[in-house]
Structures are given as C-alpha cells and as structure tokens.
C-alpha cells in the first residue's frame, strides 16, 4: 500500500466536550497565570471522521458513545458515499467496529476493512489529526453543544492535502 496511499482511509473516533480549555498559558515573570476554566455540568460528544491522503472526510458528531449500531449508521450514511472501489478502510480493533453489516456495506462499494493490532494508535495517522482538532477546540472555547458542532465543522476545513499526506508519511504509510 506504500505505492498507493490514495486508497487508504483511516477512521477513528475521539471524545469532545464543552469544557475543553487550553492546557498551557503565559504570564509575566513573577505573576500568576489567570485563565477561566469551566466548572460544573458539561456536554460530551463523540466525533468520528476519516482521514485520506488529501483531507479529512466523513466527519460526524454524535451525542452519545460509539456502539455497533451507531457505527453501522455512520458507515452507511457518512463513510460509504465517500468511498471508491479499491479503498481500504483502516481502523482500530474495537468490538463495535466488527460489524458484518458495515463490512457488507463496504463490500458493495468495492472497499474493505483492515483492523489494526490492539493498542497501536501510532499506526493510525488520524490520531495526529485529532491532536490538531482538540488544540483548535480548546482555543475556540465552545461552551454549548451547538457551538461545539460549529467549531468542529470549521476546523475540519483546516486540514490541507500536504498536511494529511505528512500524517500518512509520519505513520509509515508513504514511501520516500
């Protein structure tokens, strides 16, 4: 696959919350850093997307944790329309991902699943893309569900083809 990285599609999910705030800050020497941080009730969502060599595709935010039924809906409504014959969908080895219905949907499109070994996030370059997503979400300070969804939507457009290509290269999927 190092010769045809344009056929690789990496998917994963990550959690997003309305309490995300910057992890670091600056203050003058001798002064204490003061920054507002949310306290109390917050909303948690699951963000799932696909990373290709030229961009982030099929983004989806749901207001609950991922399970097999929701994963099947994601594959059918969001991911499958973006796939081409010969695409290989690479994902982590979660039990909710091992769905015969989702595999059949991909087979109809001429694509297939390839599961990563357990506990190997370094083999999934979308983890690097999620790091950027979370940094931008912290900066956006979205405190409502609607604001979080809008922030995620605008951040998804920030991934350039060169950046996505470098994610694949850093994970070892592109030959020099």
Description of each model-found segment:
Residues 1-176:
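Short functional hotspots at interaction and active-site rims
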């Amino acid at each position: 696959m190092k010769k045809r990285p344009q056929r690789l599609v990496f998917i994963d999910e990550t959690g997003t919350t309305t309490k995300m705030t910057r992890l670091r800050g600056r203050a003058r020497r001798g002064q204490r850093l003061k920054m507002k941080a949310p306290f109390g009730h917050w909303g948690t969502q699951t963000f799932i997307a696909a990373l290709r060599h030229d961009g982030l595709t099929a983004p989806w935010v749901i207001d609950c944790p991922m399970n097999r039924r929701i994963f099947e809906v994601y594959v059918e409504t969001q991911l499958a329309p973006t796939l081409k014959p010969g695409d290989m969908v690479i994902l982590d080895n979660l039990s909710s991902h091992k769905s015969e219905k989702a595999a059949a949907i991909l087979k109809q499109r001429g694509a297939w699943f390839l599961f990563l070994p357990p506990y190997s996030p370094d083999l999934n370059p979308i983890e690097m893309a999620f790091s950027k997503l979370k940094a931008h979400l912290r900066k956006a300070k979205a405190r409502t569900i609607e604001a979080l969804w809008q922030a995620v939507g605008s951040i998804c457009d920030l991934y350039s083809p060169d950046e996505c290509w470098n994610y694949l290269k850093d994970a070892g999927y592109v030959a020099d």
